[in-house]
Amino acid sequence: MEWTSVIEQDAARLARLALAEDGERDLTSLAVHAGRITAQGRIEARSETVLAGCRYADAVARLVKIKLEWMADDGRRIPAGGIVGTLVGDLGSILRAERTILNLLQRASGIATITRQYVDTVEGTACTILHTRKTAPGLRVFDVHAVQLGGGGLHRLDLAGIAMIKDNHWAALARNGTSLADAVQEARRLGAQAVQVEVETAEQLKLACAAGADRLLIDNQTPERLRTWGARARELRPGVEIEATGGISLKNVRRFAEAGADFISVGALTHSVVAADLALEIEPGS
């Protein structure tokens, strides 16, 4: 299935789930007879943000039958005070959808904004910023789509596509007597699109290159060691990709990029989200 179709299906699923969390009736809006009023509202950015989540907000708007028009596209940088979009419909429906739409936009835009900061920081290098699987449960596609809108690249979405042999898998190999080379070969036989191996020592790096790993994951090392290990890996296995992760922040990410990382994966893009500051205002007299 194409990625765009995956996003559309996920948006419809998440919109239904999020609205269901608020129950079948909005007692407050019913009490003030909000459904009798046709209203217009606007979504504002209270601080600079990279907009994301529009497809998901659209899915909510369709379910509650309000009209949502965007003043900017997904992935656009919105200045503080900028109008993101407008809504028209009966006030009861707008109020019912308000928090759901904002929750989706604020989380997605928060992810896109921090991702864009990382991408901008490594600009001019050959390095790509990646997400990890450290996403909120049930929000994998949503979170990853937001990373993309911020300029990040696609990593593995699940355990079925790319094999990644990490420290605990190394421990399993040691216990069952299987060699790394055999594990890499078996992963390919099982249909792995690629095989990535985490290395923590120079000896593991040598073994991973000999086993035919497509990419090496270098975790919690210094930029200097990354440079040394990366150069050695490319001597042993020309074309092998180098991914850095662990202990990387906006303050030091460029050092890792300049040290030769092809990819840098950052868990904080999705596991420590700071929501974008967005608000929905009902226009007076509407």
State the predicted function of each range.
Residues 220, 246, 267-268:
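Short secondary-structure boundary segments
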Residues 268-286:
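Short, charged, intrinsically disordered terminal tails
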Residues 171, 223-224, 281:
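A generic signature of intrinsically disordered, low-complexity regions enriched in glycine/proline
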Residues 248, 256-263, 282-285:
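Ligand-binding grooves and catalytic loops that recognize ribose/phosphate and carbohydrate rings
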Residues 235-241, 284-286:
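Short acidic, glycine/proline-enriched helix-loop-strand junctions
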